Amino acid sequence: MAAATSTMSLLPPITQQQRWHAADSLVVLASRCHNSRRRRRCRYVVPRARLFGPAIFEASKLKVLFLGVDEEKHQHPGKLPRTYTLTHSDVTARLTLAVSHTINRAQLQGWYNKLQRDEVVAEWKKVQGHMSLHVHCHISGGHVLLDLIAGLRYYIFRKELPVVLKAFVHGDGNLFSRHPELEEATVWVYFHSNLPRFNRVECWGPLRDAGAPPEEDDAVAAAAAEEAAAEQMPAAGEWPRRCPGQCDCCFPPYSLIPWPHQHDVAAADGQPQQ
């Protein structure tokens, strides 16, 4: 997963909320559908984003490892830390998913993985009683080659993320069978980059909808909505915030995957960092 300086936007048919802060060092996008019947995530794709064809999840190509996690007990991630580490092999086209209490760093070793940086890591969080899945992708930084193709990597990651989310749900199927409400949890996607344009946080809506592929008829609407959104200053986006003190409604007490610009988000909302 990783290449043309084309990008895609989360643009709902009615409203889109964005927050630009610190000289465009961080962008928070939040979108919400108002059609309660369909409850689909309102995600549109610009026409040129179809260059590489549709992203399709194939369960037969997914290998799942449970590391330190009892697959049969299905502990709720709101009570016990639960993370996902997903890597992809360009040689075999297979995915490897590790389900653990922390990031499986052994899965990320080796010169090839350090050069490609095509892993996706995620963690479950409970904030003020609401579950959310926080997904992290490395776009650029740490290697000059990654900087040169940052736009392409951003596009590829966004295009493949529905496949990634489906892999999480399928690979951790027993957890979702026991706790189906987790599919309604909000998905937050963090794109890590040393380039302000691609260093951003996006809200992809409920997990159930975030893993759905874009509709074929969305391209034209996307282009118009993207152009209109660029002409006006967006409003502040929503951001999940922990309680200021110790509580039972927030877990875990600290992030297993720190977002290096959390202070920017806190400043943008005028709230102290947690």
Swiss-Prot record:
Which Pfam family, giving just one, matches this sequence?
Answer: Staygreen
- Protein role: Involved in the disassembling mechanism of the intact light-harvesting complex of photosystem II (LHCII) in the thylakoid membranes. Required to trigger chlorophyll degradation during natural and dark-induced leaf senescence.
Name the UniProt key words of this record, in alphabetical order: Chloroplast, Membrane, Plastid, Transit peptide
Per the similarity annotation, which family is this? Belongs to the staygreen family.
Tell me the Gene Ontology biological-process terms attached to this UniProt entry: chlorophyll catabolic process
- Provide the phenotype resulting from gene inactivation: Stay-green phenotype during dark-induced senescence.
On tissue specificity, the annotation reads:
Expressed in leaves, roots and developing seeds.
Q: Summarize the record's induction comment.
A: Up-regulated by abscisic acid and dark-induced senescence. Down-regulated by 6-benzyladenine. Circadian-regulation with an increased expression during the day and a peak at noon.
Variant or mutagenesis effect after changing V99M: No effect on LHCPII binding, but decreased chlorophyll degradation and staygreen phenotype
Q: Mind telling me where the transit peptide is?
A: 1-48
- Judging by the UniProt lineage, the source's domain of life is Eukaryota
Q: Which InterPro entries match?
A: Staygreen (IPR024438), TonB_box_CS (IPR010916)
Matching PANTHER family: LP06106P, PROTEIN STAY-GREEN 1, CHLOROPLASTIC-RELATED
- Quote the subunit structure annotation: Interacts with LHCII complex.
Cellular component (GO) terms are: chloroplast membrane; chloroplast stroma
- Under what name is this protein listed? Protein STAY-GREEN, chloroplastic
Q: Is-annotated flag, keyword Plastid?
A: yes
Q: Any idea where this protein resides?
A: Plastid, Chloroplast membrane; Plastid, Chloroplast stroma
